[in-house]
Amino acid sequence: VSISSEHDYSEESSQYQWLENDLVNANQDREAHPWLITMFHRPMYSSTESGHGSEIDFRDAIEPLLVEQNVDIVIAGHDHNYERTFPVNSETVYQTDTNTFLKPEAPIHLLVGTGGRFLYPGSSSNPEWSAHFESTTHGYGILELLDKDSIQFTFYDDDNGDVLDIFTIGRINVVTPEHTPVPSSDG
């Protein structure tokens, strides 16, 4: 599910109402829609210092709805690096396991802005909600439904195919990721 982070996203806006309605309907039958994933251009969470950073107004307006409707993953771009959060709501972290999350209480946010343009350097602040950050290599991600109760995201180095980050979310139990993540060169 996606709306524009570039246009009116206030609660009164038509796109907010559409998003709310779509998420409510999907939540009524999680058997048919086991995973709720949203996508926006601008990130709610970004620790880059030289890019645009977190879109606080957008986060304040939209994040409560995403948490209320049990959204699992939020995907964004805009800043030219890769970053993954822990499950987070209003900068409060809910689980800090680096790769496996069982029934998280808040969405995991992915910033995947590594498609080919110049990359933004990382932040020296390393916020508590940031689980993994990459700013030295272009890359891409694959989101894989392992089964109706497990979903896995893997971020790959575009040059050599190395796994740079991987995590799994489970509803009943957590399937162990098949790959071992390569430590980030950013620490």
Regions found by a protein language model. Give the residues of each.
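Metal-dependent phosphoester/phosphodiester hydrolase catalytic core
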Residues: 1-123, 130-137, 142-181
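Short, solvent-exposed mixed-charge patches
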Residues: 186-187
